[in-house]
Amino acid sequence: MSFHRYRPRLPGGELAPMPWPVSLYRVLNHVAWPLEAESGRWTVFLDRLMIFLGFLVFCEHNEVDFHYLIANRQDMDNMLTGLPTYLILVEMQIRCFQLAWHKDRFRALLQRFYAEIYVSEEMEPHLFASIQRQMLATRVNSTVYLLALLNFFLVPVTNVIYHRREMLYKQVYPFDNTQLHFFIPLLVLNFWVGFIITSMLFGELNVMGELMMHLNARYIQLGQDLRRSAQMLLKKSSSLNVAIAYRLNLTHILRRNAALRDFGQRVEKEFTLRIFVMFAFSAGLLCALFFKAFTNPWGNVAYIVWFLAKFMELLALGMLGSILLKTTDELGMMYYTADWEQVIHQSDNVGENVKLMKLVTLAIQLNSRPFFITGLNYFRVSLTAVLKIIQGAFSYFTFLNSMR
């Protein structure tokens, strides 16, 4: 099945380079990653069948995780041991299978990204290097999430050493799951759920980051081209033609700007619900993780690593959102400082000067509002929103600690 999963290509037809977290996301997560557009009917049917079975597995895990919380509702410490895995399970079930429902739309977005937006290292080495620096936090976060998963996968090792039969996560089954014919398949399902959840966590973050930072680079490129066009025309064009040439260049730049904004809106449409769900669960998840890490650090190393991973994920996404917001906000000011007044001063064509001033006014109006990604229009993805979530999480922690 992995051979039929979509592999992005550049406009020339060659395979597009993908960062290692996205490549790993593609390999590990058959639920979220789309198939190739030309996949056969049986391949599509088998993929949908696997998604349906995966959904049932998530429902089963949801049930037994919740039973653990109910069984330990009188013991806050034990209940909070199982709460983080339950919260992340519910969050990922919503995000992952919502994406699975819209796989074709996601593939179309990736196709457009690599066809129109992607900044290659060969064409723009400086911009590409800047993107890699901006994405460094998401790469580190991917490594930390894998370390968090590894901590859970140490459970089978301790099972062998201490002759126990414990699941990877805190779960209560309505039957004796320690019987070998139940235990082994259930443990395998635990592993599968762990891979799907972890790959979704770092994979989607890196996909969003790539889309946002390459879009950001295109906006930077747009501003550079606008400034260069005025400088070149002032040096080369005659006083009669300079306004005409600049107006044509400005029209072309405005069309490029509209195309970039349209792509940004497509990104917003694709991710807005999943971002909302991510942020909605984050405060409670951070609170529970920090509580476990704070109350027993040496006994909850997995929770400490997981807390760091979640904390870094939110900060990385907020930082990328703030970068895009800042760039598009500055783009509105760019039209004020694009030397159009020098073009009008040099031009002797009064009619074209009037048309140019009207076009500049339109450009300023169109770019008066910066572009930003939101969570169902409730909040902007930015460091400000992330800091509010972190503040809320620590407020909940203070309350829980006082209850203890």
Swiss-Prot record:
Alphabetic keyword roster: Cell membrane, Membrane, Olfaction, Receptor, Sensory transduction, Transducer, Transmembrane, Transmembrane helix
GO molecular function: ionotropic olfactory receptor activity; odorant binding; olfactory receptor activity
Location(s), subcellular: Cell membrane
Parts of the chain on the Extracellular side: 60-67, 163-181, 296-303, 402-404
Any Pfam family the entry gives: 7tm_6
Residue stretches spanning the membrane: 39-59, 68-88, 142-162, 182-202, 275-295, 304-324, 381-401
Ranges facing Cytoplasmic side: 1-38, 89-141, 203-274, 325-380
Main location per the UniProt record: membrane
One GO-annotated biological process of the protein: detection of chemical stimulus involved in sensory perception of smell
Top-rank taxon: Eukaryota
UniProt keyword Membrane, yes or no: yes
Any single GO CC term annotated in Swiss-Prot or TrEMBL for this entry: cation channel complex
Disulfide bonds listed in the record: none
Membrane topology note: Multi-pass membrane protein
Family: Belongs to the insect chemoreceptor superfamily. Heteromeric odorant receptor channel (TC 1.A.69) family. Or1a subfamily.
Miscellaneous comment in the UniProt entry for this protein: The atypical heteromeric and topological design of the odorant receptors appears to be an insect-specific solution for odor recognition, making the OR/Orco complex an attractive target for the development of highly selective insect repellents to disrupt olfactory-mediated host-seeking behaviors of insect disease vectors. Odor-evoked OR currents are independent of known G-protein-coupled second messenger pathways.
Subunit structure and binding partners: Interacts with Orco. Complexes exist early in the endomembrane system in olfactory sensory neurons (OSNs), coupling these complexes to the conserved ciliary trafficking pathway.
Summary of the function given for this chain in its UniProt record: Odorant receptor which mediates acceptance or avoidance behavior, depending on its substrates. The odorant receptor repertoire encodes a large collection of odor stimuli that vary widely in identity, intensity, and duration. May form a complex with Orco to form odorant-sensing units, providing sensitive and prolonged odorant signaling and calcium permeability. Involved in the behavioral responses to octanol, anisole, and 2-heptanone.
PANTHER family: ODORANT RECEPTOR, ODORANT RECEPTOR 19A-RELATED
Protein name as annotated: Odorant receptor 74a
Species name: Drosophila melanogaster (Fruit fly)
Gene: Or74a
